[in-house]
């Protein structure tokens, strides 16, 4: 397996995914992973769960059948100031928060709007990763976003599902990957799995990483130790 930790996947709690948390963990084990982040959509996503779900993730065992389970969220950015749909009191209970722009939660604006939103989200200490920034619906100043991620030791996601469900994402993702290499910025390889068989699917992302010779030490989920070290950078000491 090219990566050891899945950093972006959804359960039935998201409202439009099809497996339980335990089924996702079991599939991660079947695929030889060592860890999985459960990153269900925040409450502004139609059909998703309430903030109480995220507060209560602390009851989920840290290990299930030998697989480390990280408590996460794909929070929805809900304005162009970078606010997300969970209070800080919920965010700071989680291990790995992704912030993303979704058109059902915020309408596309200008490049300046989108860039301001992502930069502001990056500056939030409880947000560790920007989700699918290659989405062509939300064009951004890629260099400004990547440089801000560098300043704050945050990760930029290269979202494998984008190559299949977000038309014209490829060119944006390649440019973002090149900029992350240029500036030494962390990336996360997210499958964005909404069904268990897609866990750890990174076929296109892996090809691009190999083609552009992206440093493996900057891939936060390449190994479990990489991921734990990335979390430690942000004050999260998980054993």
Swiss-Prot record:
It is an enzyme of class 3 (hydrolase). InterPro entries: Phosphatase_YcdX_put (IPR023710), PHP_dom (IPR004013), PHP_phosphatase (IPR050243), Pol/His_phosphatase_N (IPR003141), Pol/histidinol_Pase-like (IPR016195). Pfam families: PHP. GO terms for cellular component: cytosol. Zn(2+) 2 binds at residues 16, 41, 194. It comes from the Bacteria. Zn(2+) 3 binds at residues 74, 102, 132. Keywords: Hydrolase, Metal-binding, Zinc. Binds 3 Zn(2+) ions per subunit. Its cofactor is Zn(2+). The keyword Cell membrane does not apply. Its EC number is 3.1.3.-. The keyword Glycoprotein does not apply. Zn(2+) 1 binds at residues 8, 10, 74, 192. GO terms for molecular function: phosphoric ester hydrolase activity; zinc ion binding. HAMAP family: YcdX_phosphat (MF_01561). Belongs to the PHP family. NCBIfam families: PRK09248.1 (NF006702). This is Probable phosphatase Csac_1188. It comes from Caldicellulosiruptor saccharolyticus (strain ATCC 43494 / DSM 8903 / Tp8T 6331). The lineage of its organism: Bacteria, Bacillati, Bacillota, Bacillota incertae sedis, Caldicellulosiruptorales.
């Amino acid at each position: 397996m090219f990566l050891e930790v899945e950093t972006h996947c959804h359960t039935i709690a998201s409202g439009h995914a099809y497996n339980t948390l335990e089924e996702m963990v079991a599939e991660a084990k079947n695929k030889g992973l060592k860890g999985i982040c459960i990153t269900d959509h925040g409450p502004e996503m139609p059909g998703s769960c309430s903030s109480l779900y995220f507060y209560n993730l602390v009851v989920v065992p840290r290990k299930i059948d030998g697989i480390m389970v990280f408590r996460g969220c794909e929070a929805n950015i809900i304005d162009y100031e970078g606010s997300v749909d969970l209070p800080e009191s919920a965010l700071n209970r989680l291990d790995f928060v992704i912030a993303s722009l979704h058109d059902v939660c915020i309408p596309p604006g200008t490049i300046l709007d989108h860039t301001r939103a992502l930069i502001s989200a990056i500056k939030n200490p409880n947000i560790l990763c920007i989700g699918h920034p290659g989405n062509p619906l939300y064009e951004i100043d890629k260099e400004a976003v990547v440089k801000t991620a560098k300043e704050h030791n945050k990760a930029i996601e290269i979202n494998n599902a984008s190559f299949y469900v977000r038309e014209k994402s490829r060119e944006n993702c390649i440019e973002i990957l090149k900029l992350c290499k240029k500036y030494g910025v962390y990336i996360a390889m997210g499958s964005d799995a909404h069904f268990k068989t897609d866990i750890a699917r990174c076929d296109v992302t892996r090809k691009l990483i190999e083609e552009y010779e992206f440093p493996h030490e900057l891939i936060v989920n390449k190994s479990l130790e990489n991921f734990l070290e990335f979390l430690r950078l942000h004050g999260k000491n998980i054993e």
